[in-house]
């Protein structure tokens, strides 16, 4: 696995890609961000279209806020996005292979043709999201939260199924919807 850039160098990379203003160096939030958090905010993607095979691999961006955005053909391979908020988004052809999404809130999003190969999804809340043509091969999912109805439609290994925190209900709708 390639080495991840630290947070400061990840911000430099985001500036190079035009995703951060040159004078902006957002603080790293101390907890999972919410849609109604007050300033200062960490790095966030809100009501944005990210596409054109954008490469955001090998970055350290924990506690990032993604909201009401469309993420098409973007690579987050081997990126650290743990404790991020990925609610209310459309992810199409996105690659999270080897990424750390542990303890992230990923509810109420659409994931189509998304790779989670060898990703860390431990403790992530995936309820109210749909996963079509997604690969979870070798992904860790200890205590990941899914409904039994979702699980029936997903290709998961027996080990993954044993580690998931299965729920019968969708739970509360995430904020920001």
PLM features: residue spans?
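Tandem repeat scaffolds
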Residues: 1-177
């Amino acid at each position: 696995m390639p080495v991840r850039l630290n947070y400061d160098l990840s911000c430099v990379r985001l500036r190079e890609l035009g995703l951060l203003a040159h004078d902006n160096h957002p603080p790293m939030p101390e907890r999972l961000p919410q849609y109604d958090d007050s300033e200062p905010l960490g790095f966030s993607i809100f009501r944005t279209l990210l596409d054109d095979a954008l490469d955001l691999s090998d970055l350290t961006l924990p506690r990032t806020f993604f909201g009401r955005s469309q993420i098409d053909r973007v690579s987050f391979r081997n990126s650290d996005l743990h404790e991020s908020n990925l609610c209310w988004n459309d992810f199409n052809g996105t690659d999270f292979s080897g990424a750390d999404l542990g303890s992230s809130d990923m509810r109420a999003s659409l994931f189509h043709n998304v790779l989670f190969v060898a990703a860390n999804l431990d403790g992530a809340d995936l309820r109210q999201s749909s996963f079509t043509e997604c690969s979870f091969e070798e992904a860790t999912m200890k205590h990941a939260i899914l409904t039994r109805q979702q699980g029936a439609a997903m290709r998961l290994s027996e080990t993954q199924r044993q580690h998931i925190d299965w729920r019968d209900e969708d739970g509360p709708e995430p904020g920001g919807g």
